[in-house]
Amino acid sequence: MKHTASLTQGNILQVLLRFSIPFLLANLLHALYGAADLMMIIGAYCPAESIAAVSTGTQVTQIITSVISGLTLGATILVAKYAGRQQPDKIEKTIGTTITFFALFSIILSLILAFSTGMILQLLQVPQASMAQAYQYVFICITGIFFICEYNAFSALLRGYGDSISPLLFVAAACVCNIAGDLFTVVFFIWE
């Protein structure tokens, strides 16, 4: 099944809709990560302090993910440009640079967040009753920064080739894993 599309040929409205709808659905699914945590699992099995902690942690994670996603747009543009010009050597360099940059960026960002989580939560005025759990939740999310960076980097590269379906499938699989992981840790380990 071919997932790539030329965005410069054919009916522009149809082509853009075919490309953008999976992109929008992927963003919607990603936003539902936090909703799944809150409504389906934490809200059903944990006390109010846990709900406040996850709600705050989800906001922090969403901001971080949005920044990472925005930074990867440069790679999308470069891959699309070089693919259009049929310059495979420059595409390879862009891919290598993007993957390497975001791997290093994820390490640096994780370290910064690990040392500043308490300050961030204070700036967000997290209630004292939820502070410890919010810190714990954000810290757990920080361990996934590498995967968030690399997912967004790979998705950006694929979108540069005109493939917005594969990133949608990746984020759908990640949502299923997220919900399963949440159920496993919260329900079976009675994590509050």
What residue ranges belong to the model's regions?
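Short alpha-helical transmembrane segments in multi-pass integral membrane proteins
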Residues: 1-20, 79-144, 180, 184, ...
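Residue-level recognition of transmembrane alpha-helices
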Residues: 20, 27, 55-58, 102, ...
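Helix-loop interface residues and adjacent transmembrane-helix termini in multi-pass membrane transporters
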Residues: 32-35, 45-48, 82-85, 160-161, ...
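Small-residue-rich hydrophobic transmembrane alpha-helices
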Residues: 51-111, 148-167
